[in-house]
Amino acid sequence: MTFLQLLIIAVVQGITEFLPISSSGHLILIPNFTEFPDQGPLIDVAVHVGSLLAIIVYFFKDVLTLARGGFASIGIGTDRPDAPSERRLFWWIVLGTIPAVAFGLAIKLGAFNSIAETWFNITVIDDDLMSSIRFTDLIAFNLIVYGIALGLADWLGKEVKKFEDMSWRDGLIVGIAQALAIIPGTSRSGVTMTAARALGYSRYESARFSFLLSIPAVAGAGVLIVPEIFEAGATLAMDALIAGVLTFIAAFLTMAFLMNFLKRASMLVFVFYRVAMGCALLAFF
């Protein structure tokens, strides 16, 4: 892959991963607007890992709190005054991660292949459902539907909760929403922010909740792809490394912008963008 292609993929991923407009949808569409070949799942995961590192650095204090909660769960640091609340937040994040892990494993094992072929008339190629549903109409549909859902949740949702107020119920509901983001065009950040806003979290706290919840899921995806990285050869592995580093830079800058933007503005601009892009895809592709 050329450096230009890696740069475009990284910038698109770094921006769209954190804005609620679907990173996977934009990455899949790159070959339609350029002469570049599809970058494939390896580069997709590499840029997601770059995004993950950006989250860890930006929310380092929150990540440290969750880490202390994990240690407190195994009896380390339980004498700290904040240990009970840190432990609680840690376990609610774990609970919220389970739906995405279960859904992802089910897809990987082919549990939904027959449903996709029978109910939705989708031809599953080589038992790979995710590669088989990377098509424009599905992306457009999800951009519009989940964009409208985001707008309604942002309009009707109260702003009374912070991340520290998370209950097991909130963690599970937002976690189930996160599982839906496996489908291209949905937007992991968009669907989790939608769920959090519907539960009464402020815009800023919805984004904070969304990004912290993404850490285990994205890390897990990175771990699963490690064997493929070693099998891919040095050249492709270097491409993945470059893409990951470039994505980290773009993602960190985008996240800083978004968190400040949400302190003073609504999500309406993202709703309009999603609906407009979805309609354009249906009209021209």
From Swiss-Prot:
The keyword Cell inner membrane applies. The keyword Nucleotidyltransferase does not apply. Its EC number is 3.6.1.27. It is a multi-pass membrane protein. The chain crosses the membrane at residues 40-60, 89-109, 137-157, 171-191, 209-229, 241-261, 265-285. GO terms for cellular component: plasma membrane. It holds the Pfam family BacA. It is found in: Cell inner membrane. One of its GO terms (biological process) is cell wall organization. It catalyses: di-trans,octa-cis-undecaprenyl diphosphate + H2O = di-trans,octa-cis-undecaprenyl phosphate + phosphate + H(+). Keywords: Antibiotic resistance, Cell inner membrane, Cell membrane, Cell shape, Cell wall biogenesis/degradation, Hydrolase, Membrane, Peptidoglycan synthesis, Transmembrane, Transmembrane helix. GO terms for molecular function: undecaprenyl-diphosphatase activity. Catalyzes the dephosphorylation of undecaprenyl diphosphate (UPP). Confers resistance to bacitracin. Belongs to the UppP family. Bacitracin is thought to be involved in the inhibition of peptidoglycan synthesis by sequestering undecaprenyl diphosphate, thereby reducing the pool of lipid carrier available. PANTHER family: UNDECAPRENYL-DIPHOSPHATASE (PTHR30622:SF4). This is Undecaprenyl-diphosphatase. The gene is uppP.
